[in-house]
Design a protein with these regions (language model features):
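Beta1-alpha1 glycine-rich phosphate/pyrophosphate-binding loop at the start
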Residues: 2-74, 112, 154, 162-187, ...
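Rossmann-like dinucleotide-binding cores of NAD(P)H-dependent redox enzymes
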Residues: 47-56, 155-213, 295-300, 318-320, ...
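A Rossmann-like FAD-binding core segment of flavoenzymes
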Residues: 30, 71-91, 98, 166-264
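Glycine/serine-rich phosphate-binding loop and adjoining beta1-alpha1 elements at the start
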Residues: 86, 96-140, 429-434
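Short hydrophobic core segments
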Residues: 11, 98-108, 231-241, 305, ...
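FAD-site-proximal beta/loop scaffold in flavoenzymes
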Residues: 120-143, 219, 229-310, 405-409
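Flexible, glycine-rich terminal cap/loop adjacent to redox cofactors
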Residues: 11-13, 25-30, 38, 240, ...
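A conserved FAD-binding loop/helix module that cradles the flavin
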Residues: 264, 278-342, 430-453
Length: 467
């Protein structure tokens, strides 16, 4: 067998693996870094619905390998099949043994396949992340006139909207009472559902898919619901989430967490010496409840990757990864929906005492300007000290960056009192007015609920200091 030695070896070349390698090379310039990736072309995972729907081609959705190679990272197209932590070696499918000083698992996730009759039939698809699978899915469904999509999470909703845009008849089926339930409270979900139905999609909430109907050729011809109703279609797409790809980690003996991810500490270290895990394959801990959660986001993955890469040789990154703040954004029709932190329904389930407020304004000023969108901001604060722990926003394109600002507010444990004094930049064509900036106005509403109209400013400051 051929033998090669690297200081830092990364298994997997998705967003987490790529950022781990690039950051490691930047912070440890004298170290050799290699990424071992099975697929020759890496896709932008979040844009897959727009490839499948025909808005762009898969070749336009590729992450350039130069992002890594220009920084001095070796990119190897191979598959690691065995790891020996004692020998610090990883064996590949192409019969190469890679030695390492530091090893990072970034093996990503795989689509869930529900245990139901007919899932192995022809014309049944899951949404995989490699170029070949994406192209195969797109080719197979392009001639389908009617498609059933099972799952009302982000992938299901976004693919449904893309197919509807191209004129296909779509039935979207979800077992939850609302779409995107992991990220949004009912009022935001209902706003999205209205747009979905106006797009011509037959949305079925609170429905369980019992089995996939097939013909004598073992081709899918529709689904049967738990009510006995049969919905016929030309293809079925299963978009019911993903699970951590940890087969290699399990084989190597790594500890696996409650939600199926590789157990890691706040520096992304596993229980094996000099072995780290990042991204979808790594376990996640909620920033507030500290419970293990099954969240998978590229933005979270890259944050973990930076923490791991900087911490490979010694703990220099003082602000360790302190938990996952769920930050989502999506587009339904011409409206942007975004969420950060805890939802109101989640807070109720976790018995967190909260105060909420919602402000509705516009994303330009005056609101009579062309292309002005209604903008809705909901803030969720802890009752005992006014700390912002969650929020949701809907509106125009500016929502995409507003939610990132809200994520920073949550991560830094800012209170509603501190938000009221926030200094912001505004412009008539770009933002809401300074007199009615939605995040600040929602914070004012929360504060009035918390402290009343006559609460003194010095008392507010005293409480804010305890945050």
């Amino acid at each position: 067998m051929k033998r090669v030695k690297y200081d830092i070896l990364v298994i997997g070349g998705g967003p987490a693996g790529m950022i781990t390698a690039v950051t490691a090379k930047a912070y440890h310039k004298d170290k050799s870094v290699a990424v071992v990736r099975k697929n020759k072309r890496a896709q932008v995972p979040c844009a897959i619905p727009y490839v499948v729907g025909g808005r762009i081609e898969s070749c336009q959705n590729e992450v350039p390998d130069a992002v890594m190679t220009k920084e001095g990272v070796d990119l190897i197209f191979d598959e690691i099949v065995e790891v020996d932590f004692c020998k610090k070696e990883a064996k590949s499918l192409n019969k190469t043994i890679y030695g390492y000083d530091k090893l990072v698992f970034a093996t990503g996730s795989l689509p869930n396949i529900p245990p139901m009759e007919g899932v192995d039939a022809e014309k049944v698809f899951t949404v995989k992340k490699d170029k070949e699978s994406i192209d195969a899915l797109k080719k197979s469904v392009c001639e389908a006139e009617k498609i059933v999509i099972v799952g009302t999470g982000f992938i299901g909703v976004e693919i449904a909207m893309e197919f509807a845009r191209s004129g296909k008849e779509i039935v979207l089926i979800g077992r939850e009472s609302d779409i995107l339930r992991q990220a949004f409270d009912k009022e935001f979900a209902k706003e999205g559902e209205r747009i979905i139905r106006e797009s011509g999609i037959d949305l079925r909430n609170s429905c369980n898919t019992e089995r996939i109907l097939t013909n004598e050729k073992n081709e899918a011809i529709g689904v049967e619901l738990d009510t006995g109703e049969k919905i016929y279609s030309d293809a079925v797409i299963l978009a019911v989430g993903y699970h951590p790809n940890v087969a290699l980690a399990k084989k190597a003996g790594l500890r696996i967490g409650k939600k199926g991810g590789i157990w890691v500490d706040e520096y992304m270290r596993t229980e094996a010496e000099d072995v780290f895990a990042v991204g979808d394959c790594a376990s996640k801990q909620h920033f507030l409840t500290r419970k293990t959660i099954g969240l998978m986001l590229a933005s979270t993955s890259t944050a973990e990757a930076r923490v791991a890469a900087i911490s490979l040789y010694k703990i220099e990154y003082i602000k360790r990864f302190s938990g996952t703040i769920s930050i989502f954004s999506t587009v339904i029709g011409d409206r942007v929906f975004a969420s950060a932190g805890v939802t109101e329904s989640e807070a109720v389930r976790e018995n967190i005492d909260i105060v909420t407020a919602t402000f509705e304004g516009t994303d330009k000023h005056p609101g009579t300007l062309k292309d002005t969108h209604k903008q809705i901001v909901k803030l969720i604060a802890a009752r005992h000290n006014g700390t912002i722990i969650g929020g949701q926003i809907s509106g125009g394109e500016s929502v995409g960056e507003m939610i990132n600002a809200l994520g920073i507010i949550i991560e830094n444990r800012m209170s509603v009192s501190s938000l009221i004094g926030l200094q912001i930049a505004t412009h008539p064509l770009l933002t809401a007015p300074p007199t009615a900036y939605p995040i600040i106005k929602a914070a004012e509403m929360v504060e009035r609920k918390l402290y009343g109209e006559n609460f003194s400013s010095c008392e507010r400051e005293r409480i804010a200091e305890t945050v």
